[in-house]
């Protein structure tokens, strides 16, 4: 719909571009939400495998459940940090819940939960497995290291897990921090 009358003085009609741009913090918010969702996918996949491992052990020890598949895997018993890490779905749920209406407080809860149930248990496991890794590295054949299916040492699998999980948690915290900065109100002096 065109306006009636002459064009406003001092404009040639091309000054609309500044009104057509999306504010930078909205672009950053959408970008960081998307990136975080992509980090949640591998985190959730790893989490499913951990739930299967820990859950099958809980069913076997507490309820006498027997399954030929898990018996063939010959997995060692779960460490205490594994039980805590199984709760690392909480930051994912909190973060996704905060995305709906840009709830900054909920995102802060997700950020700190990422450290408490994600990074912290991994760091404890990393330190706890170090003597086992050193023992295995010094004497591969004579080591008493638990194995996966009686062949592959679990300590190597755990260190691969730590490398992947710490990167996922670290980058998730990094992008949550930047998303929170994009959502935070601008302070004016």
From Swiss-Prot:
It is found in: Endoplasmic reticulum membrane. Residues 56-78, 127-150 are lumenal. Its main location: endoplasmic reticulum. GO terms for cellular component: endoplasmic reticulum membrane. It is a multi-pass membrane protein. The chain crosses the membrane at residues 35-55, 79-99, 106-126, 151-171. This is Protein jagunal homolog. It comes from Caenorhabditis elegans.
